[in-house]
């Protein structure tokens, strides 16, 4: 029968003839182990990928709890709970991140490839600021640490107003125990007699000592005076001290109000000394501030003077057009060089400055005439117009001075007569010698000009005197000249008009002949100066 059954089974279904055998455990282990690539996102940035192998606990597939258990083994317990996990899966034509929980099944991204991503979790209470849980854990650890004395001094300042009488000490200590953290509360509330404290921890008794000063009597350092300092020294500053012992052998007996008063009085001497030191250190030294202000004013004045001196300390070379800073006080040698160069030296507040006179292109000259210097002509026109003896002075006589007038001012009272020298240049002597014959021939035909020559010779002596002396003798000279030379008011106006017109039109004196005078001079510095001026002839 058995042989027939075997033959029948082989003919009917060959698969039924196979014996069912269970697979070996090694085969099951190979199937349960899966390779996973995961990313960690910190500060919103993905790190480099990590690789690990996870055993599948369920025949349905890989669950997230299997991955979390493997991470706790590899990276430490609690590491996986700090992240939210998501898996990469195909969606339509691309890939998406599928958020997962612990009981969710992880789908492979491609075949047997699993890709996971862990993102940092954010706290719900601080979701607006996006603070991660890792930072919250460190903040909780910092809260356990003892608060600094600066933060506690703010709490004590609010309750220091209740220290006016003896009852306020118990009330203040009770408030501090409520405001202080548990670590400090256990230390401060534990009662120990002051004698035992001094015996055990005399060195560590005043380690955490701090003081709270009342704001009364204190003033700003900038508004302190001698009166306020003396008044504040009479009224003592009320202080409150708190001592925190660092010994670990402190017993847990309750501290009474009397013990508080004794413990506060133990450090009163030190507090008073420190209060006096702090009181004295508030007021700044007034002498230093005054001296510093004086130094600032000195520097400002020196800067202003330096700017003013720079404005008037430039020498102008007419040939090369180069500006060079000159010495503010000229010596005798420098003054001679100025006279040689036919320049005008104007004296203002004992500071010398060179004013160009023979080039009208400079705008700072008061009177841009090629024949007269501004410092001489503008001051002497009034005197010439008032004195009839000087009204007949020829313009060609004044052209030889060419701005070489030196006006000096002396501040000393002894030197009352500060004479100004009016020198004629070398060109005048040469022209006078050449024209001496022509003047002698025309002397008979023109008696008016011969009369005016002595007055022109006296011009240098009259103008060389000091200005107040000329103003005082102005009437006397006018009376003497009117006796010698009669002149009416009409002629006076006509003469003044002739002088003003001659200043505006210097070419209208001589229309017949003109001559060119050239002066070549070399200064000590090596610069060569050439002066060319057109001079009309002496004939009218």
Curated annotation (Swiss-Prot):
It is a peripheral membrane protein. One of its GO terms (molecular function) is protein homodimerization activity. One of its GO terms (cellular component) is basal plasma membrane. Residues 246-256 have a biased composition (Acidic residues). Residues 471-482 have a biased composition (Basic and acidic residues). It is found in: Cell membrane. A motif (Association to cell membranes) lies at residues 342-343. Pfam families: SOK. Residues 32-123 are annotated as: DIX-like oligomerization domain. Residues 150-163, 185-194, 280-292 have a biased composition (Low complexity). Residues 147-201, 219-294, 412-492 are annotated as: Disordered. One of its GO terms (biological process) is regulation of cell division. Its main location: membrane. Keywords: Cell cycle, Cell division, Cell membrane, Developmental protein, Membrane. The keyword DNA-binding does not apply. Expressed during embryogenesis and in roots. Residues 221-244, 418-437 have a biased composition (Polar residues). The DIX-like oligomerization domain is required for polymerization, edge localization and biological activity. Homodimer. Forms long polymer filaments with other SOKs proteins polymers (e.g. SOK1, SOK2, SOK3 and SOK4) crucial for polar localization and biological activity. Binds to ANGUSTIFOLIA (AN). 'Soseki' means cornerstone in Japanese. Belongs to the SOSEKI family. SOSEKI proteins (SOK1-5) locally interpret global polarity cues and can influence cell division orientation to coordinate cell polarization relative to body axes, probably by guiding ANGUSTIFOLIA (AN) polarized localization. This is Protein SOSEKI 3. It comes from Arabidopsis thaliana. The lineage of its organism: Eukaryota, Viridiplantae, Streptophyta, Embryophyta, Tracheophyta.
